[in-house]
Amino acid sequence: MSFRGINTTVIQIRRQVFTEVARMAYANVKGEQANHLMRKIPYTIIPGEEGKLRKDIFLERAIVEERVRLAMGLPTRRMDEHNSVVSGLEDASIADKYYDPPLVNVIKFACNRCPEKLVKVSDLCQGCLAHPCMEVCPKKAITWESGRSTIDQEKCIKCGRCATVCPYNAIVKTERPCAAACGMGAIHSDELGRAEIDYSKCVSCGQCLVNCPFGAIADKGQIYQLIQGFNRGDRIYALVAPAFINQFPSLASTGKLKAALKAIGFYDVVEVAIGADLCTVDEAHDFLEEVPEKLDVMATSCCPAWSMMAKTAFPDLAKNISMTMTPMVFTARMMKQKDPTARMCFIGPCAAKKLEASRRTVRSDVDFVLTFEELAGIIEGKDLDIDLLEVDENEAALCSASAAGRGFAQSGGVANAVANKIKEWHPDMEVKIASAQGLADCKKLLMLAKAGKYNGYLLEGMGCPGGCIGGAGTIADPARTAIQLNKYMKEAPFTDPEQSPYMSEIHVLKDDPNFEL
């Protein structure tokens, strides 16, 4: 399970790191002054002389150092080489996107070396006469010793059948949390039993980092570089994903959120749901043109973790992923058309968007990517007094987006929006859809599609449980966010994406003068 909505120690440290990196960036110093501030951060977050979290204050500070480096876009350091925490800082002190792959990293000495899978008899065993656990074990790995069941770990295949039949729930089946959360099977153990990521499988969804109870996994960020841009006076737009609802309780209204974003340095604020409206119409056109004449099935393109998984794990289906631009790219490209010298920062729930923004075809549109959690750190680091923020009621709304566009933030929202648009154009046409959330279920969906079970369908995949509202960069409990999102959808100025005042620009953004609604 993830810990969104629960203020755990791991989450507190992660957010403190974001806050202190932001404070350092706003100080706007270079050279040795910057080095001093960076070296000071671990002592600010882990004060005193005694360790309280891992009983080793030096280890605790060393882990924070690696988190600080990653938050600034810097790589983790090798454990077998001497390297200062400030190594590479000068290269990172720029107002541009900065990090090299890999995006998601294991801090090796923070890893607890959890067993990959374990089935174990607990003290709750009553030593019952029936001992069904022994009877169902296919490997005869369970024996009777000292009046209770005992599992021979050498024979056990971790099937868990014994745990299922135990009437006292005395047998526990556990799995390494990060690996259990990874729908790609990309996490295994290294030679020392520490978690290791297979980057040939990883799609940077970030679910491992929010499910690790020891906070041993973190992704790289651009907090430092973004604020360098603010300090330089760059005109930077905040492109806010619709999943922002419920993430910032102190910024309950869109007006407050907009005021806060401008106060920390953004030039203006735009809701990415306007790009979702354009995406809906474009993807509906794609489906009508491609299925079934050219393609047996078509899959949506909005979630980068889903589309990357489809292309790497199912290369034969790569052509079935819609070529429609994602809402992030549609919105960024539109704003750059309006303000060519401005820069764009996507703010959303997603770690994988950082990877999407680094693609050759996208990097000229999107300059920075922040998660909601990183944004919370920046707001804290700026020392904003939320109560004193003045809201201009004439500019309180983010933009004009449809209910359907805002609904992209939850599982099923994309497919339903596209299907409803097709039905509106062709009332007699049946549009069959199927959706999955979480990469493990997404893989199952594509396996069935490959087997021909979904011919004629529109498939939607969301890499995170619940969709974007369950993304790795969110703060709030996804279930509560879903409730607030549905309220926000009802407050939209219109329901139909084609009513968007930006729809007339779609042919320009697609660079297709022949595109017609």
Task: Label each residue range with its predicted role.
Residues M1-H82, D219-L517:
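Iron-sulfur-associated redox domains of electron-transfer enzymes in respiratory
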Residues S93-S122, K139-K140:
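N-terminal [4Fe-4S]-dependent radical SAM core
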